[in-house]
Amino acid sequence: MKDHIIMCKKIFAIFVFIGIIFSQSPDELYNAANISLEAGNIPEAEAGFNAALQADPTFAPAYLGLAQIAIRRGDLSKTQQSIKEAIDADPENQEFRDEFERLNELNTLMNKGIRSMKNGDMEDAFVSFRIANEKFPHYPESVFNMGLGYMRKKEYMEAVKNFHIAMEINPEHKNALAAIKNVAKNFFNSANQSYKRGDLESALSSYEKVLEVDKTFYQAYYQIGVIKSKIGNKDEAVQSYEKALEVNPQFYKGYFALGLAKSGLNDDEGAIAALQTAVDIHPGYDKAYGAMSDIYFRTKNYEKAKQVLNMSITVNPNYAKGYANMGMIFTEEQDWDQATSNLVMATTLNDRDVMSFFRLAGAYNEKGNCSEAKEAARKSTELKNRFGGGWFELGVAEWCDGKGNKTGALNAFEKARNDRAWRKMAEYEIDKVKNPQKYEN
C-alpha cells in the first residue's frame, strides 16, 4: 500500500512537471534555468535547459546553456558538442562561433599547463593555469590542477584553497573533494601521532588545521573534545562533541563522550540523555550502559543502575565493569551473596581490577568466609601495594573475628595504617586485636 502511494506521488509529480513544460515558453524556461545556474544549482539549471529544448528543439540559447553547464563540470568535449548544436540551430550567430573558437585557447592552455607540470616546471604550469582561470573562470579544472601543483610543492593549505574554489564552481567535483579529504586525513593522522606522544598542544593545533581544510571531518571535532576534557575544560569539550554530532548524528561514540563530559559538569539529565542516544544508535554499546550506571549509582538510584547494568552484561557477557558495578550496588545494599557472585565474575574477567578484589574481600569478610577474603585481599595488595583498603580487609580476614592469626592481622593493619585514608579505621582494629577485653559486651 505504501509503495503504491509513493508510485502515485511520483506519477503525479511527472505530470505536474510535464504540465509546467507545456505551460511555459522556451524563453521562460531558459530564463529560469539561467537563474538556477547563477545560483549554483547545476542539476536544476540542466533540467531547465533540457526542458526548453523539449519545448523547442531548435532553441539555440538552450544549447549554449548546456555548454555552460558542461564547462562547469570540466567536460570540454561535451561543451564543444553543445556549442556545435547551438551553431547548427542558429548558423548565422557569430557569438556561438566565437565561443567555439575560444575553447581552442582553453584546450591549448590546459595542455601546456599539464605538460609543464609533468616535466616538473611548476612555475610555467601555474602561469598557464592562472591564465586559463582568468579567461574561463567557470572552468574548474584550471584551479584544480593548480591545487595538484601546490600538493607537489607540499604547500597543502594553498592546494586546499584551490580545491575549494574548484568545488565552488562545480559542487559535484569528486576529485577535488577526494583531494580535500586526503589532505584533511593527513593532518588528522599527524595530530593523532602528537596526541599519542602526549603533545596535546601540537595535537590540538593539528586537529584545528584539519577543520580548516574540511569542516565536515567530525572525528577532528571529537578529538578536540577529548583533549579539552582531558585538560579539564568540560564546557568546550561539550561544544566540540556537539559539533561532531551535528556533522554525523549517528556517531554513537560522540554521544558517549558527550555524556561523560556532561556528567563531569553535574548535568546528570543531559548526560543520561546523551548516553541513552548512544545505545539507541548502537544497542550493543556496553560502555554506555556502564556510564549510565555510574550516574545512577552516584545518585543512589540503585534500581535504575541495576536495569542498565543487566543490559550491559546481556549485550556483552564479558563486560567486566558491568559485574563490578553490580557488585558495588549489592555491597551498598548489603546483599553479600549477590555481591560476591558479581565481584567474582568481575575479577575473573579482569584480574587487574584492584577495587573489585578489595570489595570482594570485604563481602567475603561480611559472610565470615575468611580464607576466600584473604585470597581476594592479597590480590588487591599485590596489584596496589600502597592502597590501605586491601591491607585493611586482609587484616580483618587474618583476625577472622578472633579465630585467626593475630600477628598476621596486626601486620596487615599496620600496612593499612600507612594510607592516611585508612589510618583511623586501621588503628581502631589494631586496638581491638591488642585489647579485645575493651570491646567485649
Indicate residue ranges for each PLM-predicted region.
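Helix-start (N-cap) detector for alpha-helical repeat units in TPR-like alpha-solenoids
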Residues: 26-27, 60-61, 94, 106, ...
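N-terminal leader/linker segments that initiate helical-solenoid repeat arrays
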Residues: 23-61, 72-77, 81-84, 88-119, ...
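Position-specific recognition of the canonical hydrophobic site in helix A of tetratricopeptide repeat
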Residues: 30, 37, 71, 117, ...
